[in-house]
């Protein structure tokens, strides 16, 4: 789901080399670049003898197209929860059949329930990573301009008295109408998936007030801009924000980039593992999914990219600064304020896209 630095490696295809044999077992993965731990892939291959071919995509739309067209040749794909919902609706994925997954019990029931808003019964998708949409903030730049800035509130974006004082140092938003509009509706006290014209009109007005203060709307670019100090606030995804923060720290920048989950609540997103309906090697696919449900397999990824995982038994294997960060693993009170994705009809999606296009054109 998330579009960040790894997308620049989208042309990469990695085939882990093993000798070709007559009855060779093969697994074809389709994922973002660098979105599986290298050690985990090597362990899987060594343990099972299955040769792994790892192809990458650089946008969710590319993956959607592959799934909807069919005959992709892939065995495991990694759609965001919104993409999984569309694939389920189009009958483009097959049931995972968790009866064959002995490690599925490691998954957090509360998170499974949130994913079930688009995959009832969790039949078609297995949570891989998860996170939130929130505020990436250059703390020093913001507090210099607004000493009493509400760093944990979307007021920072949506109230002109704050956003207007930050325009000179840069505000950006992810280019994702469904997600941003849902977050805006929730901020206004409406249902995040309201289709009422009056509610969408309020969102239109809210975004119109923000528009003069927005530097750009794009996904991915903000990571480097946060790291080098070219932005002071971005509405973005957990991992993207924390990647920018880590880059700034590693470069010894004279400022701190932080991530905050808005106190008003926000969207929880998932990247999932799913099996295309016509996957050529479905049993190998299930073997891989079960392998990634082992705590050590997914902990490697979380420690590297700062994306939370849904594996309860992986927590003891996480770095303390990751597991203890309330903006990566929020406490129970905040988790209650997180809303899952919901599939809208094509007309409802078009209504939101038109609203967003008008806002984006003016920005």
Residue ranges and their predicted role:
Residues 224, 332-363:
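Conserved C-terminal helix/tail region of periplasmic/extracytoplasmic solute-binding proteins
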Residues 81-213, 218-227, 244:
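Extracytoplasmic ligand-binding site segments that recognize negatively charged/polar headgroups
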Residues 136-141, 186-187, 269-281, 300:
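A bilobed periplasmic-binding-protein/Venus flytrap-type ligand-binding module shared by bacterial periplasmic
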Residues 94-105, 155, 251-267, 276-278:
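Short beta-strand->loop
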Residues 276-337:
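Mature extracytoplasmic/periplasmic domains
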Residues 200-209, 215, 253-274:
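Periplasmic-binding protein-like
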Residues 23-87:
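Early extracytoplasmic/lumenal segment of secretory-pathway proteins
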Residues 83-86, 233-254:
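A ligand-binding cleft/hinge motif common to bilobed small-molecule-binding domains
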């Amino acid at each position: 789901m998330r579009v960040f630095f790894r997308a620049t490696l989208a042309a990469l295809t990695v085939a882990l080399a093993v000798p070709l044999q007559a009855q060779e077992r093969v697994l074809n993965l389709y994922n973002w670049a660098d979105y599986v731990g290298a050690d985990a892939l090597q362990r899987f291959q060594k343990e099972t003898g299955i040769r792994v071919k790892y192809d990458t995509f650089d946008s969710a739309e590319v993956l959607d197209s592959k799934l909807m067209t069919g005959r992709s040749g892939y065995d495991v794909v990694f759609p965001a929860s919104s993409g999984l919902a569309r694939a389920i609706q189009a009958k483009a994925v097959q049931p995972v059949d968790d009866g064959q997954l002995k490690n599925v019990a490691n998954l957090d029931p509360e998170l499974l329930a949130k994913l079930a808003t688009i995959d009832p019964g969790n039949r078609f998708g297995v949570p891989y990573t998860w996170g939130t949409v929130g505020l990436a903030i250059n703390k020093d730049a913001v507090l210099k301009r607004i000493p009493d800035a509400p760093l944990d509130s979307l007021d920072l974006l949506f109230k002109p008295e704050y956003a207007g004082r930050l325009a000179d140092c840069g505000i950006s938003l992810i280019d994702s109408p469904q997600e941003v509009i849902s977050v805006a509706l929730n901020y206004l006290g409406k249902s995040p998936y309201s289709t009422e014209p009056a509610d969408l009109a309020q969102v239109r007005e809210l975004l119109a007030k923000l528009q003069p203060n927005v530097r750009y709307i794009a996904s991915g670019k903000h990571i480097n801009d946060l790291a080098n100090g070219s932005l002071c606030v971005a509405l973005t995804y957990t991992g993207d924000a924390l990647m920018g923060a880590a880059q700034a720290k590693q470069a010894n920048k004279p400022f701190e980039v932080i991530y905050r989950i808005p106190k008003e609540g926000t969207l929880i997103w998932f990247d999932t593992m799913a099996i295309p309906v016509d996957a050529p090697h479905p049993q190998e696919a299930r073997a891989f999914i079960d392998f990634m449900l082992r705590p050590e397999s997914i902990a490697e990824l979380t420690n590297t990219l700062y994306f939370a995982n849904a594996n309860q038994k992986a927590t003891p294997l996480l770095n303390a600064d990751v597991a203890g960060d309330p903006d990566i693993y929020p406490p129970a009170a905040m988790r209650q304020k997180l809303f899952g994705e919901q599939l809208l009809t094509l007309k409802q999606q078009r209504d939101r896209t038109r609203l967003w296009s008008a806002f984006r054109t003016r920005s």
